[in-house]
């Protein structure tokens, strides 16, 4: 009576990759089909769900300068708002009186930082969004 023994060899990932690298394209396709059938899976490409996250990660290029509080030097803040925006006295006073209010919208970072520094210099509290 003959007893067959099954000898299991330890095959490394490196050896598997080398074997696949030596195959022709048709052999690789057949291997993939056999693996799909044996394991009940498909070799469809994974869908990357990072499109929205990538957009959010982009650096912001436009900023809004928000006057959050006027401080003690209201007249100086009005003058600074007028100078930065080109508004008339009445319009600039209305912006300052309605704090928190947007002083300038859609400006680049450098301009937003400069305006913030100018308004803070005269005692206003400013936020950049």
Swiss-Prot record:
The lineage of its organism: Bacteria, Pseudomonadati, Pseudomonadota, Gammaproteobacteria, Vibrionales. GO terms for biological process: translation. Homodimer. Part of the ribosomal stalk of the 50S ribosomal subunit. Forms a multimeric L10(L12)X complex, where L10 forms an elongated spine to which 2 to 4 L12 dimers bind in a sequential fashion. Binds GTP-bound translation factors. GO terms for cellular component: cytosolic large ribosomal subunit. GO terms for molecular function: mRNA binding; structural constituent of ribosome. Disulfide bonds: none annotated. Keywords: Ribonucleoprotein, Ribosomal protein. Belongs to the bacterial ribosomal protein bL12 family. InterPro entries: Ribosomal_bL12, Ribosomal_bL12_C, Ribosomal_bL12_C/ClpS-like, Ribosomal_bL12_oligo, Ribosomal_bL12_oligo_N_sf. Forms part of the ribosomal stalk which helps the ribosome interact with GTP-bound translation factors. Is thus essential for accurate translation. This is Large ribosomal subunit protein bL12. The keyword Ribosomal protein applies.
């Amino acid at each position: 009576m003959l007893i067959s023994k099954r000898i299991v060899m330890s095959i490394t990932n490196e050896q598997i990759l080398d074997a696949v690298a030596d195959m022709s394209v048709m052999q690789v396709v057949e291997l993939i089909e056999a693996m799909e059938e044996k394991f009940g899976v498909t070799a469809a490409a994974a869908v990357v769900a990072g499109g929205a996250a990538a957009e959010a990660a982009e650096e912001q290029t436009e900023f809004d300068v928000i006057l959050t509080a006027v401080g003690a030097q209201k007249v100086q803040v009005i003058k600074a708002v007028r100078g930065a925006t080109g508004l008339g006295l009445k319009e600039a006073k209305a912006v300052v009186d309605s704090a928190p209010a947007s002083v300038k919208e859609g400006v680049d970072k450098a301009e937003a930082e400069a305006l913030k520094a100018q308004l803070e210099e005269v005692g206003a509290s400013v936020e950049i969004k």
